[in-house]
């Protein structure tokens, strides 16, 4: 698995070019198209630059769902994900990331595997919050176009708890 790890640069790139980090990707983006998957609304990572509260409010009103919050998120189901993915061309690149931490959805690894098995190029942008050892085992065989890890930063732009589980998952991912 090829990984890109960045600290401060991630935030700048995220704000300027959410999923396009170099000329090659720019060209690929324009040729094949791109679909960004947000697996949930109500991300508890609560990055300073993310409009999560606005997203929760807007999604709640549009979907007529009450009480979406950091402690009560709304997850995309695997069935809904399959319905969406099956409608886009196979050459379209699929990116997991954006306005939520994809691995907070317990079905994220299953979605990534399905995307790869469907023939789509796959990208992941993640803080790893919510990622389990089982998730790593499910996805370690996938040749990601990009797997970018947003590590904890000193100013705490993202609320990432650096504990034994987080360190162990990061080490396992890097060794896979």
Regions found by a protein language model. Name each.
Residues 149-176:
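Classical nucleotidyltransferase
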């Amino acid at each position: 698995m090829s990984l890109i790890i960045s600290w401060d640069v991630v935030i700048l790139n995220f704000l300027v070019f959410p999923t396009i980090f170099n000329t090659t990707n720019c060209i690929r983006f324009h040729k094949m198209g791109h679909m960004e998957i947000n697996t949930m609304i109500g991300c508890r990572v609560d990055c300073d630059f993310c409009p999560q509260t606005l997203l929760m409010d807007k999604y709640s009103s549009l979907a007529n769902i009450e009480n979406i919050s950091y402690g009560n998120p709304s997850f995309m189901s695997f069935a809904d994900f399959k319905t969406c993915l099956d409608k886009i061309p196979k050459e379209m690149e699929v990116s997991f990331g954006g306005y939520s931490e994809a691995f907070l959805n317990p079905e994220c690894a299953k979605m990534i595997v399905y995307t790869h098995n469907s023939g789509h190029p796959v990208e992941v942008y993640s803080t790893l919050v919510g990622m389990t050892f089982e998730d790593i085992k499910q996805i370690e065989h996938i040749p990601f176009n990009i797997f970018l890890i947003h590590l904890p930063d000193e100013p705490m732009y993202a609320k990432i708890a650096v504990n034994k589980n987080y360190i162990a998952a990061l080490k396992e991912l890097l060794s896979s």
